[in-house]
């Protein structure tokens, strides 16, 4: 009887020492800024270093990091926090818009960009849609609108800190591909960005 009590006690201690925190997770990735991405079904969440799910599973977390191998395991992308920001994606009328949440899961920059990068040294690159009135149709009695995309550097509050002077004609409603438009700019230093112009030459800007 005494041996049975000791055995039951040891089993309880063993169970306590190896308590299960999270179960039925499909994918788990390394920590970035004290948070690790976990996937369950088609949704992603984040755990802290104690294994607790601190950002609940959600479907809007994006899966790419355009300019860095960080966040890539093999051929798979996963969401990751950089500078306390993580990309999210929202689809409106079959067009994807990108924004950011913070490490508490709060939406800091609402999805409004046609493409966006992860933050790096406090800044990110984004592609924003713009429309300009370039004339007036006398027959239809309506403005003639030119749809463009423009690239900017933004800070972690979503403020535009540098216009990259490379507008491109673009109409998302007429685009067959669901892939986001491609960047023609890239960070090359802490506050340096290179921009490829239409003649395929590069200009370098400080911001």
Residue ranges and their predicted role:
Residues 20-207:
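Residue-level detector of conserved, function-critical positions
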Residues 1-22:
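Bacterial Sec-dependent N-terminal signal peptides
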């Amino acid at each position: 009887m005494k041996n049975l009590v000791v055995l039951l006690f040891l089993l309880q201690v063993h169970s306590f020492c190896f308590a299960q925190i999270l179960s039925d997770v499909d994918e788990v990735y390394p920590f970035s800024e004290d948070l690790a991405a976990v996937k369950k079904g088609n949704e992603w969440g984040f755990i802290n270093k104690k294994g607790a799910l601190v950002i609940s599973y959600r479907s809007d977390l994006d899966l790419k990091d355009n300019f860095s191998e960080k966040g890539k395991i093999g051929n798979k992308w996963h969401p990751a926090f950089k500078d306390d920001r993580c990309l999210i994606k929202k689809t409106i009328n079959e067009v994807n818009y990108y924004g950011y949440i913070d490490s508490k899961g709060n939406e800091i920059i609402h999805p409004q960009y046609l493409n966006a990068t992860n933050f790096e040294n406090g800044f990110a690159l984004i592609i924003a849609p713009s429309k300009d009135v370039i004339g007036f149709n006398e027959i239809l009695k309506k403005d003639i609108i030119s749809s463009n995309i423009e690239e900017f550097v933004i800070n972690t509050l979503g403020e535009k800190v540098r216009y990259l002077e490379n507008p491109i004609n673009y109409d998302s409603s007429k685009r067959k591909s669901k892939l986001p438009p491609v960047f023609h700019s890239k960070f090359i230093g802490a506050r340096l960005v290179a921009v490829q112009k239409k003649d395929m030459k590069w200009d370098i800007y400080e911001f």
